[in-house]
């Protein structure tokens, strides 16, 4: 009787290990490939597309027009760093002090959860993982973050991030966002336009760059102040990010 009970558990354990090994090979290959090849789509794009099809929205197309860092305004890279991860050039994927502050805040305010994900973490999860919150997903995110930080340069991480970030419903990547909201290529975005796009990133399905709320406008102004404090465009050159 005991052997019959153990056998299924052994089978499930082996199956789980094989699945994890296959995912490790898949993700490892993706990290290596996308270190040099433009990213055609992300896990978030795929999830949005499948969700739209299941809802009968067959006209929805999740798509991103890849552009190199040379074709992105330096203001845009600076804006997302100022808004999301000011220690981006310094850390190895994780901002430990920010994580500690977020944990302390979340213990005091359970209804208003604060995140502390770096641009590297956001790139890893947007590119490779499903949406949601769980310890399993966090563990995978940490491993993938270490992977891209090890293989990719900071400039590459920022380039991929800007090309797969969601700026609105069905609007992925800074080139699509620049064309949709400002009718210009990403290379010509001004400081204020870049800050406005960065201002919607916490929740691009709620906050609108084409109809900014008072909160979005105040966040845009804060981001612009942070951009100036970081040193403006020279910050990007100094840290070899453009």
From Swiss-Prot:
State a GO cellular component annotated for this protein: peptidoglycan-based cell wall
Q: Which reaction does it catalyse?
A: [GlcNAc-(1->4)-Mur2Ac(oyl-L-Ala-gamma-D-Glu-L-Lys-D-Ala-D-Ala)](n)-di-trans,octa-cis-undecaprenyl diphosphate + beta-D-GlcNAc-(1->4)-Mur2Ac(oyl-L-Ala-gamma-D-Glu-L-Lys-D-Ala-D-Ala)-di-trans,octa-cis-undecaprenyl diphosphate = [GlcNAc-(1->4)-Mur2Ac(oyl-L-Ala-gamma-D-Glu-L-Lys-D-Ala-D-Ala)](n+1)-di-trans,octa-cis-undecaprenyl diphosphate + di-trans,octa-cis-undecaprenyl diphosphate + H(+)
Query: What's a GO biological-process term for it?
Result: peptidoglycan biosynthetic process
- SUPFAM superfamilies in the record: Lysozyme-like (SSF53955)
Which parts pass through the membrane?
Answer: 19-39
Q: What does this protein do?
A: Peptidoglycan polymerase that catalyzes glycan chain elongation from lipid-linked precursors.
Q: Which family is it part of? A: Belongs to the glycosyltransferase 51 family.
> Per its record, how is this protein called by name?
Biosynthetic peptidoglycan transglycosylase
Gene source species: Salmonella schwarzengrund (strain CVM19633)
